[in-house]
Structures are given as structure tokens and as C-alpha cells.
């Protein structure tokens, strides 16, 4: 697509309607280096999904190691951050790697607005021609969401080397034995989930 209008036209009809609705609101787009609001939103999103979050120092380290190739795009409503995504840029590609939204994001359509704004920004200001929406397991919720955008999927294979284990552990959140943990984690106060999450996250792969 050559411009913002072309990008919007390339998106599937139903998803395009959500973006157009968001474009009529008071949502604003901000390119940032300060990761405070991003981490607050991302860690809350993971808590709400029942997943431990990694330490904020990982984002600090990524920004320090790749200062020219990372960027945060945050969507705000009346100054308050409602959605935010941490992105990598590589050889004409933008990769929205870590993203999330406040609970109100669903009502505001701010996540949809955010990814569209990222596409436009990456095209206009970063000379990107490819939007890599990342890997998702077939028929998962994330896969369905990306499919609604009209993304072209490419089959990728996972490879594992077992060191001591005789078989691969099922770490999928769909594994029934994790359901109780997920439900308990969703009920944790944010401060506790942000403190305890990094202590557990590195065990989850």
C-alpha cells in the first residue's frame, strides 16, 4: 500500500470497520522511548490472561541493545495510555512483538487502532513494506484475530531438543492442569503479579 488510505483498504472489511470507528474518536498516537506506560499496560494484560509477566529490565535491555531498531507506540485517550506495543524494525519489516491494552481497550477498539497506526507509521517513517504479526498456533485466538486482518499465513515448525526429559512438556495454556493456576493468577492484585511474575516467567519458555 502506498499510503494510509491504501493500508486501510487492504485490511479485511470487518476489521476495517472497527478501525474507521476508532478513527472517529479522540484516540491519539504517540511514539515513545519511555517504557513505563507500556510495561504497566502489558503486565496488566498478561495478568488478565493468567500469564506471568517477565521483568521490566528485559525491555530496558532490549532498548539499550537495539536503540535504533526498537520503538514503543502508545495509544492514549485524553492523555491516559490505553494500548501500547513494543516493536522491532528489521530490514524493511516491523514486528509488533509485545502488545496489550487496558480493559477499556475492547470498548474503544484501541488495539485495532494501534496496529493500524503502527502500519501507517512504519510505512511512512521507517520505510517498512512488511508487517510481521508474529507466530501463533493454528486455530488459537491470536491466530483468528490476525486472520481477521487479512494476514497471509506461513507454516512454521517448532523444533525442540530434549536434554533430560523423555518427552516434551505441554506448557500450553489450554492444558487442563494449568486452568486453576490461570484463574488464580487472574485474581492477583497487579502489584503482586508484577513482583511474582518475573520469578516464574523464565520457567515458561
Outline where the language-model segments fall.
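Generic detector of bulky aromatic hydrophobic side chains
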Residues: 1, 17, 51, 62, ...
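Active-site/acyl-donor-binding loops of N-acyltransferases
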Residues: 1-5, 131-205
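A conserved beta-strand-loop-helix scaffold within acyl/acetyltransferase catalytic domains
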Residues: 1-107, 120-122
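Surface-exposed loop/turn and secondary-structure junction residues enriched for glycine/proline
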Residues: 10-14, 57, 97, 109, ...
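A sequence-level detector of short, solvent-exposed, charge-rich linear segments
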Residues: 26, 30, 57-64, 115, ...
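Low-complexity, flexible helical/coil segments
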Residues: 30-35, 63-68, 108-111, 122-125, ...
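Phenylalanine-focused residue identity feature
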Residues: 38, 54, 66, 86-90, ...
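Acyl-donor binding region in acyl/amide transferases
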Residues: 91-155
Amino acid at each position: 500500500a502506498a499510503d494510509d488510505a491504501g493500508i486501510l483498504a487492504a485490511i479485511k472489511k470487518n476489521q476495517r470497520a472497527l478501525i474507521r470507528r476508532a478513527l472517529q474518536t479522540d484516540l491519539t498516537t504517540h511514539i515513545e522511548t519511555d517504557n513505563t506506560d507500556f510495561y504497566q499496560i502489558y503486565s496488566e494484560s498478561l495478568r488478565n490472561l493468567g500469564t506471568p509477566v517477565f521483568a521490566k529490565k528485559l525491555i530496558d535491555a532490549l532498548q539499550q541493545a537495539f536503540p535504533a531498531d526498537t520503538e514503543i507506540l502508545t495509544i492514549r485517550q485524553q492523555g491516559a495510555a490505553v494500548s501500547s506495543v513494543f516493536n522491532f524494525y528489521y530490514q524493511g519489516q516491523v514486528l509488533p512483538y509485545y502488545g496489550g491494552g487496558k480493559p477499556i481497550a475492547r470498548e474503544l477498539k484501541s488495539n485495532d487502532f494501534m496496529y493500524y497506526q503502527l502500519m501507517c507509521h512504519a510505512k511512512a517513517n521507517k520505510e517498512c513494506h512488511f508487517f510481521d504479526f508474529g507466530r501463533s498456533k493454528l486455530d488459537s485466538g491470536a491466530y483468528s484475530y490476525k486472520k481477521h486482518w487479512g494476514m497471509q499465513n506461513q507454516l512454521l515448525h517448532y523444533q525442540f531438543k530434549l536434554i533430560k526429559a523423555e518427552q516434551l512438556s505441554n506448557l500450553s495454556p489450554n492444558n487442563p492442569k494449568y486452568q486453576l493456576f490461570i484463574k488464580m493468577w487472574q485474581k492477583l492484585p497487579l502489584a503482586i503479579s508484577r513482583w511474582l511474575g518475573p520469578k516464574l516467567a523464565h520457567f515458561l519458555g
